[in-house]
Amino acid sequence: DDVLGFAYEDVKRAFKYFIEHYNQDRPFVIASHSQGTHHAIPLLKEMIDTSELRERMVAAYLIGGIVLPVTHDSLSSMENISACEDAEQLHWVVHWDTMAAGASTDLFGVDRPVDSLCTNPLSWQTNEELVTAEKNAGAVFPEGIYNAAIGKGEDASTAQVFEALPAPLQR
């Protein structure tokens, strides 16, 4: 908890810096994944939910909070921010876990106590109704200077072997 708390304080400081130095009172989107999702929930509650920032937050895409699931209950402590249930809704949370249907939820030796909220990004509903692939308008594929072909050329990952590191603090 201390480590996650320390990491959250860093996220909060970075968000404050962004708002004060770069945002210029413009709308913004919160986007997180995995551990970042766990930090985004308290950020929404502490910094955005009851402040003027809420009106500027277009949406919060909190993706992949598998170990500590994002649920309606985890959002219920907020006064003005809730789960998206309509494609035209603003100032809401969209969440889904990034795992295949039928995959085990027993991750890292931790069994999740409740099911996650799931906002289907094709229907914008939080029910379990399947939406067929025909409803997907497609994807935007990078072209030109935006197509870096990451991992396919000189930047392809290779195995690395590291020597043991000394203790960070010497007594």
Per-region residue spans from a language model:
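Phosphate/oxyanion-binding active-site loops and adjacent basic polyanion-contact surfaces
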Residues: 3-11
